UniProtKB/Swiss-Prot annotation:
Gene3D superfamilies: 3.30.70.60. Binds together with bS18 to 16S ribosomal RNA. One of its GO terms (molecular function) is small ribosomal subunit rRNA binding. One of its GO terms (cellular component) is cytosolic small ribosomal subunit. CDD domains: bS6. Keywords: Ribonucleoprotein, Ribosomal protein, RNA-binding, rRNA-binding. Residues 106-133 are annotated as: Disordered. NCBIfam families: S6. This is Small ribosomal subunit protein bS6. The keyword Transmembrane does not apply.
Length: 133
């Protein structure tokens, strides 16, 4: 079996269906004898350029080990699913299991302390004086 890295982007209006799609795709991979080495849900992200007049999409990354028949089934599933805007399937030499750069950046952002609240802007004294008169 060969190793593959799969990234697919889902229409932002269908973000709530992503978990079901991931379960369906991972089930089809494991039923065919493949394994999922890494699965990351990157969430909604800005696109580099508009696709079908959309500026955001929900990203999912998978690293799997499977046969060619599984890849063909996934390509068909992506092609006939209108929610999937784009997909990319790349063959890799080895199984990639470490956390991706995108996921690391997201974890670091969560670990940082939240920003201090902004000070409230007070109304101008002139406006208060005219209101009293």
């Amino acid at each position: 079996m060969r190793h593959y890295e799969i990234v697919f982007m889902v229409h932002p209006d269908q973000s709530e269906q992503v978990n079901g799609m991931i379960e369906r795709y991972t089930a089809s991979i494991t039923e065919a004898g493949g394994t999922v080495h890494r699965l990351e849900d990157w969430g909604r992200r800005q696109l580099a350029y508009p696709i079908n007049k959309l500026h955001k999409a929900h990203y999912v990354l998978m690293n799997i080990e499977a046969g060619q028949n599984v890849i063909d089934d996934l390509e068909n599933a992506f092609r006939f699913n209108d929610s999937v805007i784009r997909n990319m399937i790349m063959r890799t030499k080895t199984a990639v299991t470490e956390v991706s750069v995108v996921a690391k950046a997201r974890e670091e952002r969560v670990e940082r302390a939240p920003r201090a609240p902004r000070p409230e802007v007070k109304a101008e004294p002139e406006a208060e004086a005219t209101a009293e008169a």
